[in-house]
């Protein structure tokens, strides 16, 4: 079989001088040179300097007649055979590998250089001292390694498939559990809704009863007052008529008339009976247990919901000059010594407070504040609206855009419209603040015991920012997620 180098050499001999590609429909002109028919036709169509002169051969410049070129069938057959040899040479490399450099069949493998060599390559100086093996002999240990790798990989694949099957079953079990829990949640909330609707019906029925009793007593009161008014009107009319009579008629039975008028007193009835008033006053107390239970339910629910840990840091641009911030902006300490801080618009100048660096505009977020009041003082934690007052006195209540609690030795206060002192089982020193922006919850819990502290409900429409305040020498806090 012809070597690849020989076939390549033959192919070069049947290239068209014009397009440099393999001859297609080769034709011969008068001088004996061969060209592609299409290439020569286009060449003849190019006008020369003298339109009447015959075109010249692109190789030897001999003139020829444009219509004189003849098909070269023998050359066409040669071109076809060479192309077949090229195809066979290319396809045969898988069965009979040929050295690209020498065109000889490859028989050997150099283990030093990991190269496949022909006889000529083996005798070359660079491989003369290397370890040579026949291809099959050299391939044998590699085949053994391949068999071992295949065995190991097949085993790994089986184990992977077993893991996949096992984990799919496990995930299916988990999906079933989630589905069951989903149904439980739906069922429990359906029961809760039913319970709340029943309680609502009971309370509304009681209020309806109070409405009816009030209206009944109002009607009775109006009727009584109307009777009293009529009796007084009759006496007034009698006295006015008596006063208009002559003296003899006026003096007739005057004493009994005056006694009757003087002894007539207004009974001064009350519109609402004391018993009904007490029922009205007692009604809010009947709703308080339900309110407390719902409040505890909401606060405990915060631990079950998926809150994203808020990685917050303190903003030194907002810090009051009496607050010392750590370099990592995770800790603050109260000091009576004023810091040399610029009076920028963001800074609190009266309230010893500081805000977090970034605000919150949506989602559920939670963070923990660890408080140290070993030397007294107090600490305030919560959230504020981004437009909270920074200059002058700051009133800590929801109407001013502040939702916070204050902790001091021995007590905790919820800073609502009116501060409320809270009753807790244990003084919290680590407070978890949980914010649900969309629902409008700001919940405070003891981060250690999970005891609910307080929950604010609000309707947020703008950015809110974590808020912290300190008062008292040595009081401090630090943040964690």
Curated annotation (Swiss-Prot):
SMART domains per record: BBOX (SM00336), PRY (SM00589), RING (SM00184), SPRY (SM00449)
Domain B30.2/SPRY intervals: 292-481
GO terms assigned for molecular function: ubiquitin protein ligase activity; zinc ion binding
Keywords linked to the UniProt accession: Coiled coil, Cytoplasm, Metal-binding, Zinc, Zinc-finger
ZnF endpoints (B box-type): 94-135
PROSITE patterns: B302_SPRY (PS50188), ZF_BBOX (PS50119), ZF_RING_1 (PS00518), ZF_RING_2 (PS50089)
Zinc finger (RING-type): 16-61
Annotated localization: Cytoplasm
Segments forming a coiled coil: 142-177
Alphabetical GO biological process terms: innate immune response
Complexes and interactors: Interacts with IFNAR1; this interaction prevents association of IFNAR1 with TYK2.
PANTHER family xrefs: E3 UBIQUITIN-PROTEIN LIGASE TRIM
Family note: Belongs to the TRIM/RBCC family.
Biological function: E3 ligase that plays an essential role in the differentiation and survival of terminal erythroid cells. May directly bind to PTEN and promote its ubiquitination, resulting in its proteasomal degradation and activation of hypertrophic signaling. In addition, plays a role in immune response regulation by repressing the phosphorylation of STAT1 and STAT2 in the interferon/JAK/STAT signaling pathway independent of its E3 ligase activity. Mechanistically, interacts with the intracellular domain of IFNAR1 and thereby inhibits the association of TYK2 and IFNAR1.
Protein name: Tripartite motif-containing protein 10
Organism ancestry: Eukaryota, Metazoa, Chordata, Craniata, Vertebrata
């Amino acid at each position: 079989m012809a070597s690849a180098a020989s076939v390549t050499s033959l192919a070069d001999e049947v290239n068209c001088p014009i397009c440099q590609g393999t001859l297609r429909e080769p034709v011969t002109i008068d001088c004996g040179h061969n060209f592609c028919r299409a290439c020569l036709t286009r060449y003849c169509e190019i006008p020369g300097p003298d339109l009447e002169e015959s075109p010249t051969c692109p190789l030897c410049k001999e003139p020829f007649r444009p219509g004189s070129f003849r098909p070269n069938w023998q050359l066409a057959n040669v071109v076809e055979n060479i192309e077949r040899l090229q195809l066979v040479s290319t396809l045969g490399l898988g069965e009979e590998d040929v050295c690209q450099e020498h065109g000889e069949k490859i028989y050997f493998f150099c283990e030093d250089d990991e190269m496949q060599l022909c006889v000529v390559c083996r005798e070359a100086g660079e491989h003369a001292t290397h370890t040579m093996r026949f291809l099959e002999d050299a391939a044998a240990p590699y085949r053994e390694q391949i068999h071992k790798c295949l065995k190991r990989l097949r085993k790994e694949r089986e184990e992977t498939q077993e893991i996949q099957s096992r984990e799919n079953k496990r995930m299916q079990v988990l999906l079933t559990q989630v589905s069951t829990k989903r149904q439980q949640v739906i069922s429990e909330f359906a029961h809760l809704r039913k319970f709340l609707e029943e309680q609502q019906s009971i309370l509304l029925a009681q209020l309806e009863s109070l409405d009816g009793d009030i209206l009944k007593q109002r009607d009775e009161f109006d009727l009584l007052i109307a009777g009293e008014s009529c009796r007084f009107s009759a006496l007034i009319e009698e006295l006015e008529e008596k006063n208009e009579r002559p003296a003899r008629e006026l003096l007739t039975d005057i004493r009994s008339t005056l006694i009757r008028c003087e002894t007539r007193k207004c009974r001064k009835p009350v519109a609402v009976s004391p018993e009904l008033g007490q029922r009205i006053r007692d009604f809010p107390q009947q709703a308080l247990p339900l309110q407390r239970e719902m409040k505890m339910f909401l606060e405990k629910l915060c631990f079950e919901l998926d809150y994203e840990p808020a990685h917050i840091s303190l903003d030194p641009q907002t810090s009051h000059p009496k607050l010392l911030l750590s370099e990592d902006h995770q800790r603050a300490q109260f000091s009576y010594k004023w810091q040399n801080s610029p009076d920028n618009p963001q800074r609190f100048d009266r309230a010893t407070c500081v805000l977090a660096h970034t605000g919150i505009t949506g989602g559920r977020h939670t963070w923990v504040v660890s408080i140290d009041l070993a030397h007294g003082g107090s600490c305030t934690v919560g959230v504020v609206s981004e437009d909270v007052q920074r200059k002058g006195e700051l009133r800590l209540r929801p109407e001013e855009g502040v939702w916070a609690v204050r902790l001091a030795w021995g007590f905790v206060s919820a800073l609502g419209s009116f501060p409320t002192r809270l009753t807790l089982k244990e003084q919290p020193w680590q407070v978890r603040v949980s914010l649900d922006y969309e629902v409008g919850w700001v919940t405070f819990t003891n981060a250690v015991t999970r005891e609910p502290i307080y929950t604010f409900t609000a309707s947020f429409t703008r950015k809110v920012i974590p808020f912290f305040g300190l008062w008292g020498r040595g009081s401090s806090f630090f943040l964690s997620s």
